[in-house]
């Protein structure tokens, strides 16, 4: 938190109210910004002709001596409802769309961001995304997977507001850590 606070003093105030997509849009539609140390990876912004400018993604900074770790891996997956009337067909579809061949072809070609590791290593995909997947692979491998319990997404949304408040005021890092810890523990009870 203290590192974030020192970095926050060097950025434009708009950054404190922007989400990751707004940040990517700003960086790809203007020539005013060169570097963003932490941003969600959206591979489409690395594709030629997606926006005015291309975002070149790389692994996050190694501040721990353990590699580019500490980020979280999220995203959208696919599941089959237990009450589906076509469970077998739905399961077959889920395996197909998550499989390497679909992820490397139709899924990617339709603008999707592959989650399959074989697609991450695909030469054509990396060529077309300016090495997005190769250049961030260590970060992906060392990321922790976002928790999946029911209250987590609300915690994530609200914790960002708490951290943002810390960055803009004189509240102590210790009190923010206590507040975040309480919020996280309560996220399991919802």
Located regions from the model:
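Surface-exposed helix-capping loop/turn segments at secondary-structure junctions
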Residues: 9-17, 105, 170-173, 190
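Long, aromatic- and glycine/proline-rich binding clefts that accommodate carbohydrate-like moieties
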Residues: 108-161, 165
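Short arginine-rich
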Residues: 183-190
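Stable alpha-helical elements in mature extracytoplasmic
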Residues: 3, 86-90, 102, 155, ...
